[in-house]
Every structure is written in C-alpha cells, then in structure tokens.
C-alpha cells in the first residue's frame, strides 16, 4: 500500500480550532498562516487550551475577506490576513520570546470577553525571527509541523473504551497507508516537491484530554497512552515533529515517501 497524505490541517490561531484543507502552500514558517496569531495575557505570556479549554470552541476560517473567528455566544470577528501595522508587543512562549503585532482593539475585546480576562490578540510579523531551534517558526511550540499516521490513532483507539478523533492531537499532516507508529522510524519524508525532516517525537500534554467540540476535560486518551508510549525521559510520545527543508504546495492524496532512520 502506498503511503499518502490523507489530511492537512492549518491552525491560524494558536489553540483555536483548525481548518481542514485539501491543498495548501508553504511559506518560511511552515503551512501558510499556521499559528501566525496567538492570544497573550497582560504580561505577554501566550495563552493555550492548557489553561483555557474554551479556546477549542473558537472556529476559524480563512477566505478572500481575511481571517474569521466564531465562538458560541460571541459575534463573528473578521480580521485582515496581512500585518495591519499594529504596535509591537513582547511575547513569551515557553522559554523564548519575540515581538508580535497587536491586532485591532475589537479583537482584544472579543478574546477578553470570551476568556474572562484582559488579553490581546497578536500576529507574528512576516519579518519575525523567532527561532527556538534551527529554524524560524510561528507561534508553534517549537516546530513547524506535527505528523501523525491514521494507523497510530487506530492503535490507540483499539485500547480505549471510547475512541477519540484525530483532532485531539492537532496534527498538521496525517498519513495513511503505513503501520502504527511507522512515523517513529522516519528520518524524513518527501511529499511531492516538499521535503521534511523529522526532528523529534511529540511529547503529549493535557490538551489531548480536551474534547475539541465541547471543551470538556477528561483523563483519556493521555492515561492510556502513558501505558505504552512512554519515552526514555518519561514523556508520553505520540506523533513526530518536523521541519520543512523545501517549500511548495501540499495536496491531500499526495504520495508520501519516507526516508528511514539510519
């Protein structure tokens, strides 16, 4: 069976819902517009579902008119895709920092009303040089891509009383036609003209326990994953982080050619 790219997801706002797309271009940061926006508190710290599970209920869409955000009980928010020239604010994400452009005041008000505390929506400028590793990244934790196979999720769901959907793990690229956890053995993959280097396994956190449709928290699937996916340092590993070596356009259905480790 040929390995193929079975799904592409873009997450414009960090920790908000993603967008499933059939075809999407890459830029210097990774998938175009992926995690180019983030919500920060009054001290500049990036907010995520880890603290605010309700961020999962924010639906995103990208079109000719810009970025659209919707959430239960909230008016629709429309924002331009381009940098609007807002003032720069310092942003802290994990152990590194950068500057980002403040979005419109109405965006701050929208998010503050949703989360119940004063916060700002910021956009990473095109010229930003956030480099938690060897490459520029947007507001992703550390790497531009998360790669996961359908078979890995199937293997997990076979152990769960209640199966979970793929969106619990928020991958960018989903691969079909491979064995469970085959991605653990890859040094890289080629998808059409795009080459990606597999960098390290993704250590999973409590965000996997948040139902992305309801924002309800539970103990699964992290509890079950911990019984068979512990890494050497104790982390619970599921999926692989990756960075792109070349640019191009990815399409669902593209053949995925793995490069084995070693």
Predicted regions and their residues:
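Metal-cofactor-dependent catalytic cores
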Residues: 1-262
């Amino acid at each position: 069976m040929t390995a193929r790219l079975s799904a592409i997801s873009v997450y414009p706002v960090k920790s908000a819902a993603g967008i499933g797309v059939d075809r999407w271009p890459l830029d210097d940061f990774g998938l175009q517009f992926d995690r180019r926006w983030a919500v920060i508190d009054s001290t500049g710290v990036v907010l995520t579902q880890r603290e605010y599970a309700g961020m999962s209920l924010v639906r995103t869409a990208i079109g000719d008119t810009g970025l659209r955000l919707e959430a239960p009980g909230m008016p629709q928010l429309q924002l331009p895709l381009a940098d609007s020239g807002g003032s720069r604010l310092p942003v802290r994400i994990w152990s590194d920092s950068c500057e980002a452009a403040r979005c419109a005041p109405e965006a701050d008000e929208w998010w503050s009303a949703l989360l119940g505390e004063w916060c700002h929506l910021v956009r990473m400028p095109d010229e930003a040089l956030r480099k938690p590793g060897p490459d520029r990244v947007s507001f992703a934790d550390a790497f531009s891509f998360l790669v996961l196979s359908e078979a890995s999720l199937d293997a997990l769901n076979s152990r769960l009383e209640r199966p979970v959907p793929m969106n619990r793990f928020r991958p960018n690229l989903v691969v079909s036609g491979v064995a469970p956890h085959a991605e653990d053995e890859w040094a890289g993959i080629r998808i059409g003209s795009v080459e990606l280097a597999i960098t390290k396994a993704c250590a999973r956190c409590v965000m996997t326990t948040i139902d992305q449709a309801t924002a309800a928290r539970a103990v699964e699937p992290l509890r079950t994953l911990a019984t068979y996916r512990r890494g050497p340092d104790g982390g619970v590993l599921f999926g692989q982080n990756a960075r792109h070596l070349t640019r191009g356009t990815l399409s669902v259905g593209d053949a995925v050619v793995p490069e084995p480790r070693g």
